[in-house]
Amino acid sequence: MVPGGEADDPDWHPIQHFFGLTTFGANVFVAVRGNETLVAEHDERASGQEELYLVLEGAAAFRLSGDHVHAVRGTTVAVTDPTVTRSAVALAPGTALLAIGASDGSFATTWNASHFTQVPRADSG
């Protein structure tokens, strides 16, 4: 955990730093109290990153360029458009959020596409 944040900051676990990851960013944010900002409002215009959030525990309220998403434990929220302004607030103490981000084009899968012919995609309808 990163020590020394502001009193109203969530606990920050820099997974990318801990494991020395270089292909994508990964962090876990844990709310000390309810109504605590887990992800400050921002966009990724400068970096071009796509971001994926997974609620590990508790519940969070996401705001995505004006749209609101209520996410409970096990919910994933994907933000593929870097221009979308995003933020997340914990709805309960102990809410834990995994955040993963990477710039477009930095990942090439080694999986065989035929394994997924029967697996639906979020953007398929």
Predicted regions mapped to residue ranges:
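A short, N-terminal "cap"/entry segment at the start of jelly-roll beta-barrel domains
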Residues: 1-36, 41, 116, 120-125
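Short, conserved beta-strand element in jelly-roll/cupin
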Residues: 45-62
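Short, conserved secondary-structure segments in the cores of folded domains
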Residues: 51, 67-68, 87
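Double-stranded beta-helix
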Residues: 89-125
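Short, surface-exposed beta-edge/turn micro-motifs
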Residues: 23, 49-52, 94-95
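Short acidic-glycine-tyrosine-enriched beta hairpin
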Residues: 65-83
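Residue-level recognition of conserved beta-strand positions in structured domain cores
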Residues: 28, 56-57, 64-66, 90, ...
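Short beta-strand His + acidic residue motifs that chelate non-heme Fe in jelly-roll/DSBH
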Residues: 62-63, 79, 85-92, 108
